[in-house]
Amino acid sequence: SASLVNDAVVAYVSGSGDELLVDVFTADEVSHLSDVRAVVSVGRIMFMLSGVVFFLVLFSGYWVFGVHRLVVLRRLLLYAGVINLVFALLVISGIVFWFDGLFTAFHGLFFADGTWQFSSSSNLILLYPQTFFVDMGTAIMKTFLLGANFFIVLGGVLLALEKKWLE
């Protein structure tokens, strides 16, 4: 069933399995899924590294700036929140108003020419139509929005505490 195929694809692409445990895709589709697996792996590493860098900057800024720690911490949180908010809103706008161009640009950036376009009768396209990618992109950007708002609110709380302590 489609659900079992999807589960196998998700396990493979996410790195949970060493090989794709279904035999419904062409060699080109399997090759593309292998490329997707590599992109997901690099993306996961970049996400973790960005988190480590963020916390290193946050904590080093906190310890380096002495009496101005709260100001620096608040600014870092607000800047991180605003940058993520703007990024997410730009990508969501791109998804809504320019999906084909954004999809093509993304694939052109991460995949070799001719390795990511398939016919409309392809099992890969039938299993993952355009609406899947619109929904997935929107869900990812909603997560960015939540994170951005968290940083902005936390920065605002620190601003309120800072003002209260200065009174």
Predicted regions and their residues:
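Juxtamembrane non-transmembrane segments of integral membrane proteins
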Residues: 1-8
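Membrane-proximal extracellular/periplasmic loop immediately following the first transmembrane helix
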Residues: 10-12
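Individual transmembrane alpha-helix segments
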Residues: 14-50, 132-144
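Juxtamembrane non-transmembrane "cap" segments at the membrane-aqueous interface
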Residues: 96-121
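Terminal transmembrane helical module of multi-pass membrane proteins
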Residues: 114-167
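Hydrophobic alpha-helical elements at and bordering transmembrane segments
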Residues: 33, 73, 77, 106, ...
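Juxtamembrane interface at the cytosolic side of transmembrane helices
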Residues: 51-97, 152-167
